[in-house]
């Protein structure tokens, strides 16, 4: 496929004479054999992250979006380009799954699960987040603790099952938009459920500053 566009676009994709994004090296801290489409997904996520372009990863359910995201974080840690912790906001039902998958695929990653009645607050929460590689919480907790979490300068804010907050008027949507982050990623297996405007909502979540 040949692309034509502005000078900025040509510079962004590296020119039309070579493919973009380029292949990244997967570090041995990732305990998984990625399929080719997952490798391409990691390459693309890394490309978008390094260019500060928000991303929507919309692979079907069960195709390994969690693994691709964890691998991206491992790649950035290996290359020394991580600028802070990553926050994953997910439905309550999969918060525990994120911690389990991180322990399985990236066992060296420091993970904090911010959920439940015994969760941290205030300075203790900030310190725990800043010492972590990955913090996982739910949309419900974001509504309650968004002021505390907004004091952390996140490298990535990742929205799992992002279609759950496609309505910009909901408190969850407002809370995640208010979180400071260098880069944002929306993960969803159903980017369009009823109408095309839903895709626009997901793009707005990941490209807040554009």
Labelled PLM ranges:
Residues 2-208:
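ASCE P-loop NTPase motor core, strongest for the SF2 helicase catalytic module
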